[in-house]
Structures are given as C-alpha cells and as structure tokens.
Amino acid sequence: MKIENSNILVIGGAGFIGSFVVTELLKHPVNKVVVYDNLARGKVSYLSEQMKDERCSFYPFGGDIREIDILNTAMQGVDYVISLAAMWLLHCKDYPRTAFDVNIAGTFNILEACVNNNIKKLIW
C-alpha cells in the first residue's frame, strides 16, 4: 500500500491505539489524516501533538459509525480507511443491543461507505 500523498480516514483515531496509528501515519508524506471519533472512549488529549501537524485534523461533523450519512460524507475524497472503532468488550456484556449497533451494524456501515466512496483499501 503506497500512502504517499494520500488522504486517510482513521476511525477511532482518538483512542489509545488509534492515536499511535495517527502518529505513525504522520511520519510518512501523506496528504492528510482525518480522525473520525465519537470520543466515547477516545480523548482529544491523546492527539495533542499530532494536531500540531497541519496534515492532521478531526472530522468536524461527527464521528459515530452508526450515522451512515455522516460517515459517507467523511469518506469523500479519502483514499484509505483505517478502522479501530469498537465498543469496549466489558460493556458489550452489559449493553448487548448497543454492542450490536456499534460493533455489527456500525462495521457494516463502514463497509458500505467504503464501497460507496471507492475507498482503495480498508484496514481493520
């Protein structure tokens, strides 16, 4: 996968692991890295250093993978999508319906949005 001059959407990019993925992407000559995160578990503070790079930004209109229309818009002009979004495993037991909505339906939304936007590659 050649990421030079590409636009990359990192879903769940404000999470602990996602923030490290963003850091690694910015070490390469990418055009831009957009973080799509609902901040349910992620933290803006995880990306404080990365946001100093003009190529890095938060998607300004939301970050929930259950919102297919917003997700579709976020993927416009994107080359690659990296998805790290998921509901925390211990919460899945306590909130099974929400777990289904996020982990199953949300993942389907990501797949559908990737197809709709001709994404070159989804990494998840």
Predicted regions located by residue number:
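Conserved Rossmann-fold NAD(P)-dependent oxidoreductase catalytic core, especially the SDR/UDP-sugar
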Residues: 4, 109-124
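Residues at the starts of beta-strands that form the adenosine-phosphate
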Residues: 7, 31-32, 120-121
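N-terminal Rossmann NAD(P)H-binding glycine-rich loop of SDR-like oxidoreductase domains
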Residues: 8-28
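Structural signature of the Rossmann-like NAD(P)-dependent dehydrogenase/reductase core
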Residues: 10-11, 83, 122-124
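Conserved glycine-rich Rossmann-like NAD(P)H-binding loop of the short-chain dehydrogenase/reductase
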Residues: 30-42
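Short, conserved active-site loop motifs that form the nucleotide-linked donor/cofactor pocket
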Residues: 56-59
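NAD(P)H-binding glycine-rich loop region in Rossmannoid oxidoreductase-like domains
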Residues: 62-102
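Conserved cofactor-binding/catalytic machinery of classical short-chain dehydrogenase/reductase
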Residues: 67, 80, 106-109, 121
